[in-house]
A protein has these predicted regions:
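Active-site C-terminal subdomain of aminotransferase-like
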Residues: 1-52, 58-66
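Conserved C-terminal alpha-helix-loop-beta "cap" of PLP-dependent enzymes
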Residues: 45-129
Length: 135
């Protein structure tokens, strides 16, 4: 009779860690998390909306995606960089800034707030703004 986790060579410490992580996840207030992420996305959108050639929208979260996200669209005839150039420039920052670039060829990128704290949101907005206001 093999115990749970034994076929995968999992020790009791790892199994207890997994169970504790699950307990913490279940205790977390998911509505509060959604509100926190939505507020961070709103801050990103509000900060970037005032830049020339930039428009933003907030996705709904829920069934569409785990967290509400800020979708940023560039009018590449107005902005000093194309979206692809901006994404590349952000990745050269120190520390690097990674945004969702699946639609960069279409002039859109996404800022996902899930792994950002309030200070990091400010940094991301600052770096995007700096790149889009340079000539």
């Amino acid at each position: 009779r093999q115990g749970i986790g034994r076929p995968l060579k999992i020790g009791k410490e790892e199994l207890v860690g997994l169970l504790r992580a699950l307990e913490l996840f279940l205790e977390e207030d998911q509505d509060a998390k959604q509100d926190e992420w939505r507020e961070r996305s709103r801050r990103v959108a509000a900060s970037l909306d005032g830049l020339g050639g930039v428009s933003t929208e907030i996705t709904g979260g829920g069934k569409v995606s785990v967290a509400p996200e800020a979708v940023v669209t560039l009018d590449e005839e107005v902005t000093p960089l194309t979206c692809v150039e901006l994404v590349a420039a952000l990745r050269e920052e120190e520390p690097r800034v990674f945004v969702g670039a699946d639609a960069a060829e279409d002039g859109r990128f996404v800022v996902n707030p899930m792994c950002l704290d309030d200070d990091q949101v400010e940094y991301v907005v600052e770096r995007i703004s700096a790149q889009l206001t340079t000539d």
